[in-house]
Every structure is written in C-alpha cells, then in structure tokens.
Regions:
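Glycine-rich phosphate-binding active-site loops on the catalytic face of alpha/beta enzymes
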Residues: 112-114, 172, 218-235
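N-terminal small/glycine-rich loop or linker at the start of catalytic domains
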Residues: 1-19, 70-87, 130-144, 185-194, ...
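Structured functional modules or segments
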Residues: 500-602
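Terminal or standalone catalytic/regulatory effector modules within metabolic enzymes
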Residues: 28, 34-35, 39-52, 281-287, ...
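Acidic, compositionally biased tether/linker regions
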Residues: 345, 423, 432-522, 602
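Active-site beta->alpha loop and helix N-cap motifs at the rims of alpha/beta catalytic domains
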Residues: 40, 45-156, 161, 167-168, ...
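Conserved, mostly hydrophobic/aromatic
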Residues: 12, 33, 112, 168, ...
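Catalytic cores of alpha/beta
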Residues: 151-156, 205-220
Length: 602
C-alpha cells in the first residue's frame, strides 16, 4: 500500500513563498498535517536554508527544532549530495557534521541526490546518515537528454545498496517523465536495486498526477505531495487528489484528506490572491515546452526584464539546451540547472558564446562537481581552459577547522559551524542577529523571573521579530513590557546571477496614474528603506532611469526581513522621496514613475 510524503512545510519556507506565512502559522500548518497520516513531513532543504539565512530572523536549525516539538510524524530533509544545502561542494567532515546536526535536531529521513547522478558523491553522506541512525533515501534525477536516461539511471541504481541506501527515490524536477516512462523506470529500478522505490515529481506539463499513479502501479510505495493550493501554484502533485485517486483504485493511502483541506484553508488565507511567478501561463508554457523547471524559467525571465530584453526568453531557453548538451547532459536539478542557465544568459546578452565563463560553469566542465553523464564537448573544454588559468578550481574544500579559524570564534556550536561553512559571511550576519535577539530576550526575562511571564515575553519578542510593526506594548496584572524594533541598518549579501530563489517580494502600493500621468509608489509596510542590496553597492534605481515591470526598486526591511519592492509599470523614475537607510511608514511616498509604453513580454 503506497504511503505519501508531504512537502508543504518545505515549500512554504523557501522562495517564492518564503515569508508569506509567519512562523507561527507554519507551525500551525505542521500540527494539522501531523494528524493527516503522512509517512513523513519533508520540512527543510537547500531552498529553506538559503531563504532562512538571507532573511536573518532565525536559524534553519531553530525552525526544525520548533517543528519537531510540535509533531510526531517523522521529519525529512532534501539534500544535494556533496553540496548539501548550498551551491558549492563541501568537505567530507563538514558533510558528516551537518548530517549529525540534522539528526540531533530531529531529522529522521534524508532524501539525498547528487546533482550529476554521480552516486559515488553520495558515499560520505550516506555513511554519515547510517551512523546517525537515519533513513537514507538515495535520489536519482530524471532529466531528458540525448539517449539512454532510463538505462543510465538503472545502472546507477544497482550501486545504491552498497552505499547503504534504504530506498531509491526517482526525482523528476521538470515534469518530463511521462506516465508510461515513469512506470517503466520505477519497475526497472526496483528490480535492479532490490530496494523500495519512492517517486517525486514537479513541473508545469500537467502530467504529475498521472505519472505518480503510474509509478504506484509499477511498485512505488512512497510518493511526494503537497496541499492543493501549493500543488496548483508550484506545479506539484496534490495530496488530496492523489489520495482520492488511490482510494478509487482500491489502494487506500491512509490519508485523512479533511486535514489537508484544513491546512489548505490556513495557507489560502495568506497567499490565496497573491500572484506567484511560476504560475504565470507564459512561464508554465515555456517550462513545459523546453522541459525546464518552472522556477528556473521564471528567474531567467526576471533577469531578462531587468535588462529590457524580455522578448529574448525563448532565445535563452534554446541556449540553455545547447549549453547543457555541450556540458555533457547534466541533470537540471539545483544548483546545476542554475549554472547552465547563467552561462546561457551570458551568451545571449553578450551576443557571443563562451566569451565569458562563470566560475561555476568552469568548475562543472573541469570536473570539480563530479562526472557528467556524457563527455564534455572538446571544443568547449578547450575554450574554458584557455579562458582561465589552470588553478581556477580551488584546492579541497575547507575543513571544519579551517572554517572555525576563519570565523574567528563566531561559531559557538557545530550547527553554527556548518552554516558558516556553506553560507560564509551571510551566515555570520545571521548569527550576529540571532545573538542580538537572544540578548534582548535575556535582558527582558532577567527583569522578571516568573516562568509564565518569561514565556509571554519570549512570545512578544517573536511577534515583533516576525512582523513589520515598530513597537508593541502590553500591560497585564501589573506588568508592562514594551518591545521596540531596532533601527540600526544591516547589509545584504550579494545576489546570485541566476537563482531559483529570490528575495521576498512585497506588494507595493502603486496608485493609478492621476491627471499628471505619474504613478506614485508607496511603502506597503512600516520598515527601513534601502536603495541598494548592500552597503557600498550601486542603488537599484536612480532618478532618470527607465524601469520595467517586476524590476526591483528598493528593499524594505521589517525586523530583519528584507522585502523587495518591485515596479508594476514600465516607466522613468522621476523622483525618489526617501533617503537610504531611513525609516518609512505604511503608505509613505517612496517613488514617482512616469509610465512609458514597452513591447509586450513573450
């Protein structure tokens, strides 16, 4: 009888939905899903760690611990082989320490795939998972290539029992695995590996539910799902639909769908009418046409619009396919898909191929990430070698002791150490913010030793930390406590070239053009106004510059949550009414934009 895995908490905690639900509501959703009968709740992964580190409110470990204390269902995490939750491979001792930290914080199920399907890269992590007593679910990524995807994955599956895997997961990040192929692949992998097989699928082609049912028919006994609003928005398999379909086929999943609809109602209250970029029809259509992850296509579209080149999206998508073929047909799972897309974007914008090579693509071609499924095009390999010195690939990744020394005492625990190892200065900034928050909590609590009151103070601090309010004051039973938002500005790390994750997007208050034709952009929240992504960086926009829809105008920080404010119209910035790093109120005028006509986007 097939069991279902729920990925709702992970999806709510990463882009493009990160920040839409307060932490308290996410924990409420987790408690509801805990009663639904899932085999596992997958609550974290690379996207969650990235979003949490950049938002600088709580550590990813704090989020996992908070969920663990509220649910009994086993918790899972999605990892990218030697990349773990980052964008660069890490050393073996960091891998081991990360797995140990995850297990100590309550993770029991580790879904682990190598972005290149080089399963030898799973050996160290697999051993660490086994040592920690976790379940090692080894993933194989399906991405359509030239020939032989099925045969290649079956051969890799034969190696997984020797690595200690307890289950094989077929992972389709693009939705290209049609039902009949899903049925064949699951059956062959199950026979070749002699292990149980699970099935994860996403993509805008619309075949996910049919592929999942075909996989179950072939013997898959674990299928990933999410609640209906997220399935619809992010092109996943709906738990409600799959459970009811299985029931109709006489294969009860044991799922209480009433609980799923209850969770869906909570989520819908927060994101029901707000647009999420991957759902845009033109993005979904292009993703399905080119067999690409919809989030990747959405990210490319954003970058092209920023360069006033939205009409070149199809040209870039064609180029992604060419670059992928020349790079040995690697799968499109993160971060490899982002690397290929970044290189293709450069080719189109520069109007020349391989005139510039990004470091990550160079590392991919030179083997730093592992062996690609097919041979690298010799011409491309030579071009990459000529464009860079031989030592472009760094020596072995930093060890734990190297990281500890460079952090200069900031890493006070193993879990902080591994965060710094993978996220560098961004993690260091997060840890400083968290320590400051803990200091404020301790100072407040020290003034009142009553345990019940102390807990209420902690909750009050969390409310201010998660919201955009400037100050909260309560008075009850003779106790008066006021918690005020700190006003000191904080910098942001550099944004990636192309990423499937983005900074939180705040809905702006952009009024319709009055008689003078100027659009007035007002602040949608109380916070601090930043004109640039980091101290010393150029501003997002200046007076006199032309902007396009979805182009970032500024950041509004509310309790260390950085929210992008984007243009809704194409036009020329006529005035900026707030200085950098100044506090703003709800509805305060920020920009005036004079609309201009632009060609429609593809």
């Amino acid at each position: 009888v097939p069991r279902l895995v729920d990925t709702t908490i992970r999806l709510l905690s990463q882009e493009p939905l990160a920040g839409r639900l307060p932490t308290a509501e996410i924990l409420h959703v987790a408690e509801i899903l805990d009663r639904a009968g899932f085999a596992c709740l997958e609550v974290s992964g690379g996207g969650v760690f990235d979003a949490t580190v950049r938002r600088r409110v709580e550590t990813p470990w704090e989020r996992i611990r908070a969920i663990r204390t509220r649910v009994d269902t086993p918790l899972g995490i999605a990892l990218r082989g030697r990349f773990l939750v980052g964008s660069q491979p890490v050393s073996g001792d960091i891998v081991g320490r990360f797995i140990a930290c995850a297990a100590e914080n309550g993770i029991e199920v580790f879904r682990l795939h190598d972005p290149l399907n080089d399963v030898s890269n799973l050996r160290e992590a697999g051993a660490a998972i086994t040592n920690a007593g976790g379940a090692f679910h080894a993933g194989l990524v399906y991405s359509p290539g030239r020939t032989g995807e099925t045969d290649t994955l079956v051969e890799e599956a034969r190696k997984l029992p020797d690595l200690g895997a307890t289950r094989v997961i077929v992972n389709d990040p693009t939705g290209a695995l049609l039902p009949h192929r899903a049925q064949e692949l699951v059956a062959r992998i199950k026979e070749a590996s002699e292990l149980p097989v699970g099935f994860y699928v996403q993509g805008s082609a619309g075949t996910g539910l049919a592929a999942a049912l075909a996989a179950v028919e072939a013997g898959a006994d674990l299928v990933a799902t999410t609640v209906y609003p997220l399935a619809l928005t992010l092109h996943r398999v709906s738990g409600e639909s799959l459970a009811e379909s299985l029931q109709g086929l006489g294969q009860a999943s044991g799922l209480d769908t009433d609980r799923l609809w209850e969770a869906a109602d909570v989520i819908d209250e927060h994101i029901g009418d707000e647009p999420v970029s991957p759902i845009a029809p033109r993005i979904a259509v292009r993703a399905a046409e080119y067999d690409l992850p919809s989030g990747l296509v959405a990210a490319l579209d954003v970058h092209l619009r920023a360069h006033t080149a939205a009409d070149r999206l199809e040209e870039v998508l064609e180029e992604v396919g060419k670059v992928r073929a020349e790079a040995g047909w690697p799968p499109l799972a993160a971060p490899i898909g982002q690397i290929l897309a970044s290189q293709a974007l450069l080719h189109v914008l520069e109007a020349r191929r391989y005139g510039t090579v990004i470091d990550e693509f160079r590392a991919l071609v030179q083997g730093a990430y592992g062996e690609t499924p097919e041979q690298i095009d010799p011409t491309v390999a030579r071009a990459v070698a000529l464009l860079a010195p031989p030592a472009v690939i760094e020596d072995e990744p930093l060890t734990a002791e190297d990281v500890r020394e460079q952090a200069e005492g900031l890493a006070a625990s193993e879990e902080e150490l591994v965060l710094i190892a993978m996220f560098g200065t961004d993690a260091e900034e997060l840890l400083r913010f968290v320590r400051a928050r803990h200091s404020r909590e301790a100072a407040l609590i020290a003034e009142d030793a009553d345990a019940e009151r102390a807990e209420r103070i902690r909750e009050l601090v969390k409310i201010v930390q998660e919201s955009g309010v400037g100050e909260i004051e309560i008075e009850d039973e003779g106790m008066r406590v006021s918690v005020r938002r700190a006003d000191e500005p904080a910098g942001l790390g550099a944004l990636p070239v192309v990423a499937s994750t983005e900074t939180a997007v705040a809905p702006s208050l952009q009024t319709a053009p009055p008689a003078d034709g100027v659009v007035r952009v007002e602040s949608p929240m109380v916070g601090v106004f930043y004109r640039s992504p980091s101290p010393g960086a150029p501003p997002f926009v200046d007076v006199g510059e032309t902007v396009v829809p979805e182009q970032t105008l500024c950041l509004i920080e509310a309790m260390k949550l950085f929210n992008e404010l984007k243009a809704e119209v194409a036009g020329v910035v006529r005035s900026i009414h707030v200085d950098n790093a100044q506090p703003v109120e709800f509805g305060q005028l920020l920009f005036e934009i004079e609309p201009v006509l632009v060609p429609p986007a593809v």
